[in-house]
Amino acid sequence: MRKELEHFTIDGSLGGQQEWFPEYWMKIGGCGAVTACDICIYLARYLKMPEACPFDAWNISKEDYLSFGEKMRPYLSPRPTGIDRTEIYVEGFGRYLADSGVSGIGFREISGTEDVETAVREVRAQIDRGLPVAYLMLMHRDKALDDYMWHWFLLNGYDETEERFLVKVVSYGEGKWMDLRHLWRTCRRRKGGFVLLETEKQIEPNGLQTGYVPHGE
């Protein structure tokens, strides 16, 4: 079974990109702010929370997105060590939502020290609810994942069979299917984790696509 959440595009880019920002620190360390902006656009579109996004969430331009990123920056400011703990992300993102007049959204943190099957269950349940997942990965033994180390990205879908549980990783303007169990088993001492949104609001039906699609099609 494959389930994917809708995600906006800007000039062919799936979601925003930190590389768009002219300022050095946002360009190299703006991943936390970018994931928060993407989530806010989703909230405005599918949870009827227009206060979450200061622009028209259905017609957002690259210029709008850059302005939005600068608005988010004081709350999730890039720093030399990065936003390297989920509690930093929750505190900053929570302040942004409160200052913007958004209510009815809470957060729950899942530590990277949890076992892998807990991670699978939590991601599956969150996507089934129609909500994206903010994921922090620090170090990983697999050097092929270098671009995703010390990095925040979104999960907005899963593709599950008896053999594997793939997640759709949204970052750098594209979506890639990756094995969640492999991502989670970093074999490194410091762990990241992910942040789940909690709300009792009804997600709009077009926020979620469901159905079985063989992986790769």
Placement of each model-derived feature along the sequence:
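Active-site-adjacent structural segments surrounding the nucleophilic cysteine of cysteine proteases
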Residues: 1-87, 216-217
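Active-site-adjacent substructure of cysteine-protease-like catalytic cores
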Residues: 112-169
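C-terminal domain-closing interface element
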Residues: 78-103
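Catalytic cysteine-centered active-site loop
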Residues: 102-114
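Noncatalytic regulatory segments and standalone regulatory/sensor domains
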Residues: 146, 158-217
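Non-transmembrane alpha-helical segments in soluble domains
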Residues: 40, 94-97, 124
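Solvent-exposed loop/turn segments at secondary-structure junctions
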Residues: 38, 139-142, 173-175
